[in-house]
A protein has these predicted regions:
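N-terminal cap/lid segment of alpha/beta-hydrolase-fold proteins
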Residues: 1-24
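The alpha/beta-hydrolase serine catalytic core
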Residues: 12, 106, 124-210, 214-223, ...
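Short, surface-exposed "cap/lid" segments of acyl-processing enzymes
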Residues: 20-60
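Short beta-to-alpha linker loops that shape the active-site pocket of alpha/beta-hydrolase fold enzymes
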Residues: 36, 69-73, 136, 227
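Alpha/beta-hydrolase active-site loop
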Residues: 49, 79-99
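Glycine-rich "HGGG/HGxG" loop immediately N-terminal to the catalytic nucleophile
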Residues: 68-82
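Alpha/beta-hydrolase fold nucleophile elbow
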Residues: 100-111
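Glycine-rich nucleophile elbow surrounding the catalytic serine of serine-hydrolase chemistry
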Residues: 109-119
Length: 251
């Protein structure tokens, strides 16, 4: 079903996928975080396949899956900021925790959404495990030329208001404040799987290796041979994600 998640003053569009025949007792929930949109006006369309992925995961695992749109994307309100997106992950986790019969919450994310999943899990022990697909280890490339990246944000449509951000320097400083590489060390011993395509042209596979190293060998690193950046479209990555879900010991 379609729903809305409150993140501060903003409403985020969400797709809540649940088993058609719910088993008795608590049911695990997965919060699914999309990545940064690609291409002109990509903010409107780039996350459109996530509801289908959520439905597929539910059909195969029996979990509840919450797939939401970050602020500035799809039908969600607001404009992109990195700390704002981190707030959105927390709001989605709050929503999942408060759903009736939730039996624990896990988070999975693609690209920037995966990096933010790591950062939220480092601060939120309600999150019982994290799976990432093509997550970057840091956001320094966005910080390197903040005004050029701001122009890119307007092009893809994640910043819709001409008056936003009110302070470009403060907006850009958030890219240095959000540090997935530091956050990942706080997640073990909770389950952590890092999936990455060996031929990812957007986020190099070295980022996944750096994250795994920072987790002190306690992450399950899966490098998928020949795969690119959009792992949600790779059946091997989706199968690995479902296998990870099934190993969480909740069935």
């Amino acid at each position: 079903m379609d729903g809305a998640i409150q993140s501060g003053d903003l409403k985020l569009a969400a797709h809540i996928a649940q088993p058609s025949r719910a088993a008795a007792g608590p049911r695990p929930a997965l919060v699914l975080c999309h990545g940064f949109p690609a291409g002109p006006r990509g903010a409107l369309t780039s996350a459109q396949t996530y509801p289908d992925l959520a439905d597929h995961l539910v059909a195969e695992t029996g979990w509840t899956v919450v797939a939401f749109n970050f602020r500035g994307t799809g039908e969600s309100e607001g404009n992109f900021s990195l700390l704002g997106w981190l707030d959105d992950v927390r709001a989605a986790v709050d929503y999942a925790v408060d759903m009736p019969r939730t039996g624990g919450v896990w988070v999975a994310g693609s690209s920037a959404g995966g990096a933010l999943a790591l950062c939220e899990a480092a601060e939120d022990d309600r999150i019982l495990g994290v799976a990432t697909l093509a997550a970057p280890a840091e956001f320094d490339n966005w910080a390197s030329d903040a005004r050029a990246f701001l122009a890119h944000c307007r092009l893809v449509g994640v910043i819709r208001d001409s008056s936003f951000p009110p302070d470009v320097e403060a907006w850009a400083a958030e890219f240095k404040k959000v540090q997935p590489l530091a956050a990942v060390a706080e997640i073990p011993p909770r389950p952590l799987v890092l999936m990455h395509g060996s031929d990812d042209p957007t986020v190099p596979v070295s980022d996944a290796r750096a994250l795994a190293d920072a987790a002190d060998g306690q992450a399950d690193l899966r490098v998928i041979a020949g795969a690119g950046h959009r792992l949600r479209h790779d059946p091997r990555a989706v199968a690995a994600l479902m296998g990870w879900m099934e190993r969480q010991g909740v069935h």
